[in-house]
UniProtKB/Swiss-Prot annotation:
Disruption phenotype: Leads to cold-sensitive growth and elongated buds. Is synthetic lethal with a MUD2 deletant.
Tagged with keyword NAD: no
Gene: SWM2
Source organism, top-level taxon: Eukaryota
Family under the similarity heading: Belongs to the SWM2 family.
UniProt keyword annotation of Flavoprotein present: no
Protein name: Nucleolar protein SWM2
Annotated compartments: Nucleus, Nucleolus
GO BP: 7-methylguanosine cap hypermethylation; tRNA processing
Keyword annotations of the record: Nucleus
Primary localization class, coarse: nucleus
A Pfam entry, by short name: Swm2
Classification via InterPro entries: Swm2
Length: 146
């Protein structure tokens, strides 16, 4: 069995992390397991943090002129995995790329009969999923500690 997370593979990933020709944008979404394995090795972790700091510095100095926003997103994700917290010193970070995946025009769809199906823990269809829903009026002050 091939170990995808061996030292040389992880080192190669760090070598190509900032090169979109070596690791295209489409692969950014699947890098997290590699980042988690980089975090387990002190030398690779140190090297990764250095790469991220360098790119963050370039971004803060010159923005998207010198650093592709996708590289900054990768470094932000890597930083979060390695440090367990977000990098806060970045000026005008690139927008998140996962907010809108695709816009779909549904104006041409007419009389679409869509029904939400819900299943119980045994996989049986629930005919009326809100049948046992109980709504109660609750005083918010009961839950606020004074």
């Amino acid at each position: 069995m091939i170990d995808l997370y061996n030292y040389s593979n992880l080192e190669g990933l760090l070598d190509g992390l900032t090169d979109l020709n070596r690791i295209p944008k489409e692969y950014s979404a699947v890098l997290e397991p590699y980042f988690q394995n980089i975090a387990r090795n002190a030398h690779l972790k140190s090297r990764a943090l250095k790469i991220c700091r360098s790119n963050f510095h370039k971004w803060n100095e010159e923005g998207a002129k010198t650093v592709n926003p996708e590289i900054i997103r990768r470094c932000l994700n890597l930083w979060y995995v390695l440090k367990g917290k977000e990098y806060k010193k970045l000026k005008d970070p690139p927008p998140a790329d996962n907010i809108i995946k695709d816009e779909i025009d549904v104006s041409y769809v007419k009389n679409l009969n869509v029904v939400r199906l819900e299943f119980d823990e045994f996989g049986k269809l629930i005919s009326n999923p809100l049948e046992n829903l109980i709504l109660e009026e609750v005083e918010v002050n009961d839950f606020i500690q004074e």
